């Protein structure tokens, strides 16, 4: 008989914002702080918002201008409630703001420091290791972990709730950062307990929330929960398809899955809508999750592609973007060398900027297809293309030539560009690549001696380039990514130098 499992999920509360508060010796629960890079303009996305600032209706992933707007609205209300309509001072502390209505709401904008957050995350993981072995912990993200605690409850003579609280209190005592936890009989339920149920319970004095779910309590509490997008893996696309058939909750999905074959609502409908993904959706609707911690640890992903992308800080023209694409291709080639991989297919996607259609002169010139972005704005349809190489390679020169040929072919020279994505497909281990020369069709009209000499020259060139790539990688690993740069990295509009100093696209 299979052992009953117990899992704990822990999410550090507003992690980046909490770290910035602790670095300033401030209380993360009462300090109004947002982590964002103001140098990227007010359109930049906030990486984190402190709990006290979220109380003003600011979402966790707001854009900076939304924070400015919400704070302005809050201050207008505060000002109207003052007899003489004048503030006596400012404060970014929610406790002071709550006791003194004459203070103007203020907040701290903290530029992101990704290396610092990684350091805190490592320290917190070390705390978890005091209680749970690494093979029973899955690091889901920099601020979230899953744990299989089944074998630890008897050892510690604790309930899952007590063990979760013990670890959270240890983290709080050591770092000053609080957390939310979910406990469940499978990985999905502990995640949902943390993401949905815990958000609707009162925190303790330290801001800690802990919620528990099993299959039956999940159905009782959450089968009627809306919106359905609150559930893990259910995005707007899923929700829209379900809504077209009058399915708005997980309970609706569960009931649909047990419909008879001659009825409209049955599992065939779900498979028609979502294909093989319907299986997991149905499992989750019932509170089932077949995946275990052992399976996560045993999983070895098969690398079939690698992708690099960036959103430019401002609209770039054709030539400046071409420079950035060259930089990205150069770095992708080094990444392939570092991983011992080769490719023979490159995919390039270029996203155009909204200014192409908001500027009257540009809009008048553009005659191509128009689409709508995720914010409902009209933009020119993106450029997308694929190019196949003659051989599998990680050569910078061969990849650069191919990508530049593709870029020049698919990109509209008159449009401003905002997004770039490059993907290397059909990856293979460089040591297992077959020798293409083995099955060559011969003819009487080819000078094979000249062909042989040409190939020998090409191989010698590739060999020299490979040694140079390996030398560059060695220097970069030892002295930093910016220890060695190319001339193009210093040209106007180049982004590689700045991006080399970032983690996850943000300041380190």
Predicted regions and their residues:
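C-terminal hydrophobic structural anchor segments
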Residues: 405, 409-468, 473-474
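Hydrophobic, well-ordered secondary-structure elements that form the walls
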Residues: 348, 422, 480
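Short, internal active-site loops enriched in acidic
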Residues: 150-152, 185-190, 350-357, 425-431, ...
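DNA-contacting surface of Y-family translesion DNA polymerases
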Residues: 9, 230, 238-417, 437
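Generic "edge-of-domain/loop-turn" microfeature
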Residues: 40, 154, 188, 311, ...
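Gly/Gly-Pro- and Ser/Thr-rich, intrinsically disordered tail segments characteristic of DNA damage-repair
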Residues: 1-293, 444, 449-508
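Intrinsically disordered, low-complexity regions
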Residues: 44, 71, 303, 308-309, ...
């Amino acid at each position: 008989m299979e052992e009953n499992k117990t899992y704990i999920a822990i999410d550090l509360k507003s992690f980046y914002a909490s770290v910035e508060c602790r670095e300033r010796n401030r209380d993360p629960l009462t300090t109004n702080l947002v982590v964002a890079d103001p140098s990227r303009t007010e359109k930049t996305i906030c990486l984190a918002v402190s709990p006290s600032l979220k109380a003003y209706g600011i979402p966790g992933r707001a854009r900076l201008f939304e924070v400015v707007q919400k704070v302005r609205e809050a201050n207008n209300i505060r000002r109207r409630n003052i007899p003489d309509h004048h503030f006596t001072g400012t404060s970014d502390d929610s406790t002071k703001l709550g006791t003194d209505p004459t203070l103007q709401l203020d907040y701290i904008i903290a530029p992101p420091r990704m290396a610092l957050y990684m350091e805190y995350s490592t320290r917190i993981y070390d705390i978890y290791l005091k209680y749970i072995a690494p093979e029973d912990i899955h690091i889901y993200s920099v601020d979230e972990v899953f744990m299989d605690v089944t074998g630890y409850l008897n050892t510690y003579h604790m309930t899952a709730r007590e063990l979760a609280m013990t670890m959270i209190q240890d983290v709080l005592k050591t770092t000053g950062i609080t957390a939310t936890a979910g406990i469940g009989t499978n990985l999905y339920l502990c995640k949902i307990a943390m993401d949905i149920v815990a958000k609707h319970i009162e925190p303790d004095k330290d801001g800690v929330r802990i919620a528990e779910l099993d299959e039956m309590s999940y159905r009782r509490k959450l089968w009627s929960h809306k919106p359905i997008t609150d559930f893990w893996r259910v995005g707007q696309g899923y929700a829209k398809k379900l809504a077209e058939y009058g399915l708005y909750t997980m309970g609706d999905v569960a009931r649909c899955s047990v419909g008879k074959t001659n009825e409209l609502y049955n599992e065939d409908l779900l498979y028609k809508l979502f294909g093989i993904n319907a299986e997991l959706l149905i499992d989750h609707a019932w509170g089932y999750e077949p995946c275990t911690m052992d399976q996560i640890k045993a999983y070895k992903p098969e690398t079939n592609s690698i992708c690099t992308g960036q959103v430019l800080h401002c609209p770039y023209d054709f030539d400046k973007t071409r420079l950035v694409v060259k930089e990205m291709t150069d770095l992708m080639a080094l990444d392939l060398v570092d991983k011992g991989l080769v490719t023979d297919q490159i995919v390039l996607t270029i996203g155009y900027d909204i200014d192409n259609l908001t500027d009257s002169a540009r809009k008048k010139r553009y005659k191509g297809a128009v689409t709508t972005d995720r914010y409902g704005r009209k933009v020119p349809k993106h450029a997308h293309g694929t190019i196949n190489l003659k051989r599998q390679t990680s050569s910078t020169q061969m990849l650069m030539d191919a990508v530049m040929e593709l870029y020049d072919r698919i990109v509209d020279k008159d449009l401003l560009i905002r997004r770039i994505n490059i993907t290397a497909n059909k990856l293979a281990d460089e040591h297992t690549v077959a020798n293409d020369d083995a099955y060559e069709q011969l003819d009487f009209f080819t000078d094979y001696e000249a062909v042989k000499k040409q190939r020998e020259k090409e191989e010698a060139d590739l060999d020299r380039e490979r040694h140079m790539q390996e030398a560059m990688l060695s220097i970069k690993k030892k002295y930093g990514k910016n220890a060695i740069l190319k001339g193009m990295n210093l040209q106007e509009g180049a982004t590689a130098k700045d991006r080399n100093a970032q983690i996850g696209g943000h300041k380190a």
